[in-house]
Amino acid sequence: MGQDNIKVIARNKKARHDFFIEETYESGIILRGTEIKSVREGRVNLKDSFALVENGEVFLYNMHISPYKQGNRYNHDPGRKRKLLLHKSEIRKLIGKTKQRGYSLVPLSIYLKNNLAKIELALAKGKKKYDKRQEIAKKTAEREIRRAFKERQRY
């Protein structure tokens, strides 16, 4: 088989900071003509976006795709809800998980795979404030340990 040609367009950096990521899914996304042109230009924002399961289908909300520059009056609505394409078994699994308290569907990134737009969707559980503080403290401690090792290796 051929190589998968992947180009990351946008990442949701806040998602990994605000949530514990439990599982990730790759899903397709239904876009209109001017939307895919804007995505290819990299004019996408995933910051406050989330996904919900409605009537056995998964929809992505608050993903902002800027209007296409050369678009005319048929340009798309930047904040509309967009349908995600997942296998039926994955959707059933997500329905069960998202009904549990604290679980959400959060997009981690949008990318082009063989010229098709894909969303990396995560089943995530929200972090509390103290969880975020612990993670920041752990990262700074690891950074200081690496710095100390680097200093010792110099001499």
Swiss-Prot record:
Pfam families (UniProt xref): SmpB
Keywords: Cytoplasm, RNA-binding
GO biological process: trans-translation
Keyword Thylakoid belongs to the record: no
Gene Ontology cellular-component terms listed: cytosol
Signal peptide per UniProt: none
GO molecular function, one term: RNA binding
Primary localization: cytoplasm
Superkingdom classification of source: Bacteria
Location in the cell: Cytoplasm
Statement: the UniProt record of this protein carries the keyword rRNA-binding: no
Classification via Gene3D superfamilies: 2.40.280.10
InterPro entries linked to this entry: SmpB, SsrA-bd_prot, SsrA-bd_prot_CS
Protein family membership: Belongs to the SmpB family.
HAMAP family: SmpB (MF_00023)
Described purpose of this protein according to its UniProt entry: Required for rescue of stalled ribosomes mediated by trans-translation. Binds to transfer-messenger RNA (tmRNA), required for stable association of tmRNA with ribosomes. tmRNA and SmpB together mimic tRNA shape, replacing the anticodon stem-loop with SmpB. tmRNA is encoded by the ssrA gene; the 2 termini fold to resemble tRNA(Ala) and it encodes a 'tag peptide', a short internal open reading frame. During trans-translation Ala-aminoacylated tmRNA acts like a tRNA, entering the A-site of stalled ribosomes, displacing the stalled mRNA.
Name recorded for this polypeptide: SsrA-binding protein
Lineage: Bacteria, Bacillati, Bacillota, Clostridia, Halanaerobiales
